[in-house]
Amino acid sequence: KKALHLFVNDAIGFGMESEMELKFSDNCFGTADAISFKDGVLRIHDLKTGMSKVSFRQLDVYTAMFCLEYRHTPHSIDIVHRIYQGRDFMETSPNPDDILEIMELMIEFDPVIERMKSVV
């Protein structure tokens, strides 16, 4: 319950939007729990209610979709990721090169998926 309270209070405090859909294409989309982009800082927060080990990879993917959708390069913005779980949160700033790599994969494989869909 503590992480939920922290998550809600921080989302309000940072002026974040909740449940925002990010979409690169019909094949590549997702919903960020809380997100904001202000003064060159992209902030994405995720709430995990389970107790299993978490990874920031999902937030990296959301960041890549944000950059593609809104035409930003990950090197030109600051990025802050938070995952709330249990009684606390973890925070990181991903390497922009990692985000760029995800963006390149999305660009490369989206047309492949489209072609596969037309064959099925």
Labelled PLM ranges:
Residues 78-85:
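Extended hydrophobic secondary-structure segments that form protein cores and membrane-embedded regions
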Residues 111-120:
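Accessory terminal regions of nucleic-acid processing enzymes
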Residues 1-43, 54-57, 69-76, 89-106, ...:
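Catalytic cores of nuclease domains that cleave nucleic-acid phosphodiester backbones
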Residues 4-6, 47, 62:
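Broad hydrophobic/π-residue packing in well-ordered secondary structure
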Residues 45-47, 83:
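Compositionally biased, intrinsically disordered low-complexity segments enriched
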Residues 57-65:
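Short amphipathic alpha-helical face segments that pack within enzyme cores
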Residues 47-53:
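Short beta-strand-loop-alpha-helix junction that forms the active-site gateway
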